[in-house]
Structure formats: structure tokens, C-alpha cells
Amino acid sequence: MIQVLLVTICLAVFPFQGSSKTLKSGNVNDYEVVNPQKITGLPVGAFKQPEKKYEDAVQYEFEVNGEPVVLHLEKNKGLFSEDYSETHYSPDGSEITTNPPVEDHCYYHGRVQNDADSTASISTCNGLKGFFTLRGETYLIEPLKVPDSESHAVYKYEDAKKKDEAPKMCGVTLTNWESDEPIKKASHLVATSEQQHFHPRYVQLVIVADHSMVTKNNNDLTALTTWIHQIVNDMIVMYRILNIHITLANVEIWSSGDLIAVTSSAPTTLRSFGEWRARNLVNRITHDNAQLITAVHLDNLIGYGYLGTMCDPQSSVAITEDHSTDHLWVAATMAHEMGHNLGMNHDGNQCNCGAAGCIMSAIISQYRSYQFSDCSMNEYRNYITTHNPPCILNQALRTDTVSTPVSENELLQNSVNPCYDPVTCQPKEKEDCESGPCCDNCKFLKEGTICKMARGDNMHDYCNGKTCDCPRNPYKGEHDPMEWPAPAKGSVLM
């Protein structure tokens, strides 16, 4: 079994005293300055990895408010799909699509040692940038732009002042609300076992950046792509509680000009985007959902998405305004709009996630959480039960969604799949399958079980009792109009 190289970073902490300063993420009232010092070492019994720019596992040690913190991170190997691609356009409008190597990337997930409720989403591309939770509080870390310095700022999520304090809203409804329920810290919010149990679903995502995003990033396509990667890395953490696994299939950048009319009218723009996706994007890229990100200021909104439309070729879409210099805020907004696609409506004041506002809050406020409420969980469960969108049933890729095996350290493993041993990276004994429409609780469903309901004059598809995928009914015609998009095959454990 391959061992990973552990890297410990000792951070000297110097609290900043004085008035607020402007960081890249906005005006911050108070932050601590930390200076990373990289120390490498191997745990007992570990073998040195082949040379990589970014280690599979890293640790950072520092202090927050005088409290020592050990941050354990593991590379997010489920971030990119197997055939991940990037698309941009030449000045004459010609499409250019490439498949860049992404195995040795710089995006991590993790936790804080001795805090079971903690989580983290960090990029190490250019310094440390991202968020982590500690004792129910959310902290952000980002590099300070100081010449010849490796200093970073660490500050609380709510300490970041936004330039525009006016409420920002989602366009699905125009209902403002403020929670009048007692606020509980996230560490005190315990979901029931029923709430915590969701069958896994797999969303292959495409992010499309319009030309305003290119202009906003000074025509730097690399910087724009990195921004999108950070957003998706955050979204994956947010959807983990629903057992939804998001993989990024493609980033499309309209570098030579918009391919639709992008205006301040979110409904009009989204309608055009959905039509473009149905006639263009679905024929080029295998995916389940597409999100448009724009720097155009939408009319009194920051996002808009269709409700309960996952897998629909035209309506499995949403639009998000790039409204913040903090990627966590933008990620929460995009997660919100995708939540609509997955059947979740806006939260009411009876909904609870342990914060003043949850992901599906109708408005975004300074204290908005990146967690789904109990109401959202119930609405998602109802949507999956009644609609069961077929395109997200099957795992797109097995090898990239299981972490490199790690032992003799405290790093978290990918343990969300009960059919798979995350420590040995081997199938559990006596199990038939890992996932798929004909796989349930690690066993093949019985022959004759319906795995795809008929629509109109079509015929049902049935499990054969031998595979985890849903075999096409041989008595169907040559073309089944409902077979879009073609689902990926499930993973069978041999």
C-alpha cells in the first residue's frame, strides 16, 4: 500500500492590531498574520512518494486566537472527471478544447484535529487560500500581498465587510426573510440518522464563464479557471451532507465574445443559456448540469435557477453573478442555484442549519452559512423519491473519487461509500457492486427490477441481476428519445 508524504507547516502567528485593512477578499475588520514555514518529514513506516508538485496529504499547524490548530488536508481526487476538458475560443471564434493534466492539482479538503464537526476547503496553488471551521466558527485564510513575504491572513467569515451591504437575492422568488428562531452553533446541530442517510448521487458539472468574466480577470484565462476550480472545490464540501458527489467535467470560457445575449435580466439570460446548452453543449460534453457565471450585474439578484429540473437538456441550468471577491460566497450562491435544480425551494423562518441563514436562504447576508437546512434536506429527499433524475444515479469515475490510501496518520479517508474499504482501497468482501441504478446496499438488484421507468410509448428498462448498470431493453426501438444524457456505467466490484 502506497504511503503518502506528510508535510507539516509551522505558522508563527502575529495578531494584527489597528483599523481594518483591504485584503483581496474585501475589507476585513480584524485578522491574524501567519507566516508558513514548511517542514517535511515521513511518518513511521511510510515510503517516499514519487516527486509531485503537490503532495497527496499535507498538514498545517498554527494558532487561532491563541489556540493551537492542526489542519489535516487531503487532495480532492474527486474534483475533476476522468475526461475533464477546458474550452475557450480563438479571436475568430473557433472552438479550442483541451484535456489538461489535472492529477497533480492543488485543491484539498480536510478537517481540524480534535474537532469532529470541522471541515476545510483549501487551495495551495499560490499560497494557502480557502476556509476551515473550528468550534462551529468559519475562518478564511488567504495570502497577504506583501513583497518578499509568505505572510497570510486568517480571519472570521463574518469579519469580512462587503462593499455592498444591501441584501442580495435569488430570483426564484422575491421573498425576504430573517430568521426569528434562536441561532445554534453548527457544532451543536446534530442531524438524525434518517437525515444523514442519502443514497449517493453523482453530478457531472460544467461551468461556463461569459465574456464579462474574461474582462473582469484582465483576459487572464488561467486566473479565471483557477477561480472556478476554487468555487467547485467549495461546493463539493457543501453537498457532502446530501451524499451528492460533484465532479467538474468542463470549464468553458467565452473568451472571444458571448455566445448568447447576457443581460441584467436573469430570467431572459437563463432562458437563452438553456436553449444554447440544449442545442450545443450537450452534444459536445457529457454532463448533467451547467452553471453560467457572469460579472454582469443582474437586476436586484445574484442568481437564478429552474426548480426541479436536474437532467433536463434545456432546464438543468442556473446563472450566478460573480458578486464577491471571496470564492466561498460565490460558491454558496452557485450551490444555492443548483439546489433549485435539485428540487430545493427557499427556506422559511422555521428552517434550521445552525446559523442565521442557510444555503437555500432567499437572501444572502453577512452571516449566511454554507450548510443546507433540515427543510432543504427534506425537499431534496422528496424530489429524489418522486422524480429520481436518472443522469445522476451512476458514478462518473471510480478511480478519481477514492483517495490515496493513508495509514498511521489522522487524515480522513473517503468513507462515504459503505461498499468500499477506504483504508485498503479494496472492495469489501462478499459485496457485488459499489454504485449504480441496479445496485442497492452493495448488492445487485433482482432480475426484473425496473431501473428506468417508461415514458409515453417507451418500454421499461430492467435490471438483469448481474450488473449494476441499467441495461437497455432489447425490445425498444433503435432510438429512445428519453435516453438523454446517456448515464455513465456504474462501478462493479470484482
Curated annotation (Swiss-Prot):
Expressed by the venom gland. Zn(2+) binds at H336, H340, H346. GO terms for biological process: proteolysis. It is an enzyme of class 3 (hydrolase). Residues 21-193, 410-431, 482-494 form a propeptide. GO terms for molecular function: metal ion binding; metalloendopeptidase activity; toxin activity. Keywords: Cell adhesion impairing toxin, Disulfide bond, Hemostasis impairing toxin, Hydrolase, Metal-binding, Metalloprotease, Platelet aggregation inhibiting toxin, Protease, Secreted, Signal, Toxin, Zinc, Zymogen. Residues 1-20 form the signal peptide. It holds the Pfam family Pep_M12B_propep. It is found in: Secreted. Its EC number is 3.4.24.-. SUPFAM superfamilies: Blood coagulation inhibitor (disintegrin), Metalloproteases ('zincins'), catalytic domain. The keyword Secreted applies. Residues 417-478 form the Disintegrin domain. Belongs to the venom metalloproteinase (M12B) family. P-II subfamily. P-IIa sub-subfamily. Monomer (disintegrin). The disintegrin belongs to the short disintegrin subfamily. This is Zinc metalloproteinase/disintegrin. It comes from Echis ocellatus (Ocellated saw-scaled viper).
